[in-house]
């Protein structure tokens, strides 16, 4: 015989002992310290039980009114992006619906979140399907600044921004972002199908759209699209100042990629090399081999019709050979205080780098 049992449980507001959830949350609590959690809830449940008292077909639905939830320590370091962020994060007045059926845990909710001392809005949907976690979150940021240094992007504190994150956390600890979107006034940053390894290295990427003004008030408007195993980068304008600065501090032992071997074809109408100087019709290609830049060829023209060419190639001896020539050196060398009086003429740079050691020759004539 099988008996069907159902019921309802009502919990008044209480300060809950989070340690009681350790069997459910497994090792998630090892890196998180929760100070308190206050809530009230209404839960409906049902299950079948046989004559041997074995339970099956368990179903649980809970409407949770989360009044206060304070984390005083957590492993996420979001301070590079949110300067006011601390380990202490406070959630208030969240309405949460929880459904549990067999191997599927479904959580949906929304409410207030404090980043530092500033109040923001958060909504989320999290589905744990037998260890595979599907998430869809939206964070509205109005009272905090938002910074993305490698894109030279900064949202002013008084402006509103919407961040959407949608993806899957797989059992093998790989993370797939199906959609990352940041929207603020006329600015938009969009990333689709970004695959990260368990070490948070980029394994694959399908699409990137940049359409925003950066800290220099320069327009970045480009698109990256995947075609089979290769990529194209096309656009109206791009500020490469930050990219140039970062390349000067490059650490060849580090990489943001994993198992990455692809070719990029590039064509950009206007490319800024600093706030005031730019080139027209940048085109060429570059190739990554075993996660590192293996070959690059780029050509472009300054506004006065002077040319520049850059090539990088790694030979069979693992030497990286860089060649750069231009008949308009002024915008390229004026950033260096030790080079004065050579702003006209011809620039020829040649470098060989191996095992972190470079031998370079610079001619300005």
Where are the regions that the model predicts?
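Membrane-proximal interfacial segments on either side of biological membranes
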Residues: 1-365
């Amino acid at each position: 015989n099988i008996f069907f049992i159902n019921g309802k449980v009502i919990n008044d507001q209480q300060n809950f002992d989070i340690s009681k959830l350790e069997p459910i949350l497994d090792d998630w609590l090892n890196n998180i310290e929760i100070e308190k959690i206050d809530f009230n809830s209404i839960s409906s449940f049902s299950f079948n039980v046989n004559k041997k008292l074995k339970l099956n077909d368990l179903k649980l639905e809970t409407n949770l009114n989360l009044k206060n939830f304070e984390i005083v320590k957590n492993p996420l370091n979001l301070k590079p992006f949110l300067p006011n962020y601390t380990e202490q994060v406070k959630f208030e007045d969240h309405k949460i619906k929880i459904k549990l059926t067999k191997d599927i845990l479904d959580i949906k909710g929304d409410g207030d979140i404090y980043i530092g001392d500033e109040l923001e809005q958060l909504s989320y949907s999290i589905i744990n399907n037998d260890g595979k976690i599907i998430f869809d979150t939206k964070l509205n940021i109005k009272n905090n600044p938002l910074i993305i240094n490698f894109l030279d992007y900064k949202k002013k504190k008084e402006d509103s921004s919407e961040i959407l994150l949608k993806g899957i956390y797989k059992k093998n600890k790989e993370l797939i972002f199906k959609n990352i979107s940041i929207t603020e006034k006329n600015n938009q940053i969009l990333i689709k199908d970004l695959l990260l390894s368990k070490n948070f290295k980029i394994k694959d990427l399908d699409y990137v759209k940049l359409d925003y003004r950066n800290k220099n008030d320069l327009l970045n408007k480009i698109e990256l699209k995947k075609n089979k195993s290769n990529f194209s980068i096309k656009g109206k304008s791009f500020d490469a100042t930050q990219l140039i600065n970062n390349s000067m501090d490059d650490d060849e032992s580090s990489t943001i990629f994993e198992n990455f071997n692809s070719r990029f074809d590039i064509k950009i109408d206007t490319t800024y090399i600093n706030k005031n100087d730019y080139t027209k019709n940048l085109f060429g290609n570059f190739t990554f081999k075993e996660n590192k830049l293996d070959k690059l060829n780029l050509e472009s023209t300054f506004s006065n019709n002077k040319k520049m060419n850059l090539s990088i190639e790694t030979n069979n001896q693992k030497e990286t050979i860089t060649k750069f020539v231009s008949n308009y050196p002024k915008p390229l060398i004026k950033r260096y205080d030790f080079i004065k009086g050579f702003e006209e003429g011809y620039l020829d740079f040649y470098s060989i780098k191996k095992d972190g050691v470079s031998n370079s020759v610079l001619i300005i004539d």
